[in-house]
């Protein structure tokens, strides 16, 4: 199983992957985890990935272009069984979801 994770803060994931159940899976050769910096696909001199807020409220609005460009670049390298896009208003991840994902080969999160 290969898991490619796209994020603007890859350094935040170093700790959990070095000391968790994912580390044991990596050590046993059951999973590969690759973290990709979304800003590498951002626009302009500052590799911007966020957009202007609209409608008020707190939070960050992401541009779709950098994410699409990153996913397309990854898909050129290999075929993925799933592309998972997490949102704050999505469904809650549970054990049933984990069991279903464990049957897949490669995925992008």
Residue ranges with predicted function:
Residues 1-109:
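Post-transcriptional modification and biogenesis factors for structured RNAs
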């Amino acid at each position: 199983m290969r898991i490619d994770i796209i994020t603007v803060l890859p350094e935040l994931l170093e700790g959990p992957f070095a000391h968790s159940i994912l580390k044991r899976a990596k050590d046993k050769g059951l999973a590969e985890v690759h973290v990709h910096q979304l800003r590498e696909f951002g626009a302009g001199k500052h590799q911007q990935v966020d957009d202007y807020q609209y409608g008020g409220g707190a939070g960050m609005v992401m541009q779709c272009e950098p994410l699409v460009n990153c996913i397309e670049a990854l898909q050129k390298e290999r075929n993925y069984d799933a592309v998972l896009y997490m949102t704050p208003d999505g469904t809650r991840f549970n054990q049933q979801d984990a069991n279903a994902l464990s049957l897949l080969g490669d995925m992008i999160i």
